[in-house]
Amino acid sequence: GIQTTKANSLTTGRIYKAVIDKERRGDYLGKTIQVVPHITDEIKRNVKSLGQKYHYDFVITEIGGTIGDIESAPFMEAIRQLKWELGKNAINIHLTYVPYLRAAGELKTKPTQHSVKELQSVGIQPDVLILRTEKHLEEPVLKKVASFCNVDLDCVIQSEDLPSIYEVPINMQNQGLDTAILRKMGEPIGEKPSLGPWRAFLERRNNAKDTVNIGLVGKYDLQDAYKSIRESLSHAGTYNDRKVNITFINSEYLTDDNVAEKLEGQDGILICPGFGQRGIEGKIVAAHYCRTHNIPTFGICLGMQMMVIEFARNVLGYADANSREMDEKTPHNVID
């Protein structure tokens, strides 16, 4: 794999801060700071320097948001300039949505057409289109999109809903996305990779023999808040031939009275990280119940801290044990 660093994640805040710091140092010799060229140049510098510093063969840059948003305007201009400067060494791939109207049984390509027109209006012509859809798109639909969006037919790729995100690369390869990208960039097209290890991973994932139930004790209801933890558990399950069933348990509503009911049927508990006072007592309750009932428990960051505090309170006898973050005046500061 590739070891990523903070250089691999770029935010608007970091861009603006870098430009302001340069202005304060006098790098711009007193010139008026503007979105174009100063902000756009900083965006381009970061994208280019990533490839130059780490000697990557390809730099894949994802621009978040929706075309037409005010916030993304400087990034769109930077991408337009990059394409002009790099020529065939850069291509633009546009991800767009093709909704399916169930009541009418009809697929709508208008949102995609308008999205591409918005891109074209700022000087960007997509080289490849990825169409997100919940229903398989037949060739007439793909031809229509290619024609109206001025894109080669073999560069219109559909990304339909699949049981697992890990099946997407196989689906993309089967449609020739890798070949289309190499052709557009003028790179030699070699033998089609077998993706053997990836297919073996999918085989194990889809044919797990047993099931394990893991409870996530946390306080953030948004599913993506613990995305990396969920995926890590899923990966671990795959390599142990287990399907992992994950149950979210909100620590904010976890008490001594309901903890047995909430944690019932779990083979293991993971106490999640977080910030602030909200929900920490529920995590301590969960840690206590798991320890006294021999349930395998894994605490990450704040979760681990709550396990230490629970042990200090209930085993060492420090009833007021806490962390300095939660209580600066605690006489028994077990987490500093």
Please report, for each region that a protein language model flagged, where it lies by residue.
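Flexible phosphate-sensing "switch/lid" loops adjacent to ATP/NTP-binding sites
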Residues: 1-245, 251-268, 275-276, 282-289, ...
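Cysteine-nucleophile active-site neighborhood
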Residues: 262, 268-336
